[in-house]
């Protein structure tokens, strides 16, 4: 199974990069996990939020693996449990899907990008910092994969 996470933004605190790397390492042979940062568009000086999101959309679309099952993180998305996320991964794996999760920038994502997604998901009803979202998503993906492989990491 191939899982890609694209996140708009760079220059995260070291603890964020270390936590994402730690969970990414844990996937081992159970899943191929890739994380890629997308350069954010600078705001101000004639670039408003709409223009910025449009520029970021272009970069995101270029980075999505061809034919990938696209999942965008959005506050209006469904919030699955860890077990439900595992069931989604199981289905995608059985269908031979390469799954790509997208974490938008500070202003979110364009409606067009959201419409292209085959699923909208949220991690929480709370507003979370982007660095925390990277860590939480990677941990939950690792947890879901561990559930599918009956690894003792997840306990009910």
UniProtKB/Swiss-Prot annotation:
Keywords per UniProt: Cytoplasm, Methyltransferase, rRNA processing, S-adenosyl-L-methionine, Transferase
Gene Ontology terms for molecular function: rRNA (pseudouridine-N3-)-methyltransferase activity
InterPro entries documented for this protein: Alpha/beta_knot_MTases (IPR029028), RlmH-like (IPR003742), tRNA_m1G_MTases_N (IPR029026)
A Pfam cross-reference name: SPOUT_MTase
EC id: 2.1.1.177
Reactions it catalyzes: pseudouridine(1915) in 23S rRNA + S-adenosyl-L-methionine = N(3)-methylpseudouridine(1915) in 23S rRNA + S-adenosyl-L-homocysteine + H(+)
Main location: cytoplasm
Positions with a binding annotation for S-adenosyl-L-methionine: 73, 104, 123-128
Localization in the cell: Cytoplasm
Gene3D superfamilies, sorted: 3.40.1280.10
GO cellular component labels: cytoplasm
Function: Specifically methylates the pseudouridine at position 1915 (m3Psi1915) in 23S rRNA.
Alphabetical list of PANTHER family matching this protein: METHYLTRANSFERASE, RIBOSOMAL RNA LARGE SUBUNIT METHYLTRANSFERASE H
Family assignment from sequence similarity: Belongs to the RNA methyltransferase RlmH family.
Subunit-level organization: Homodimer.
Name of the protein: Ribosomal RNA large subunit methyltransferase H
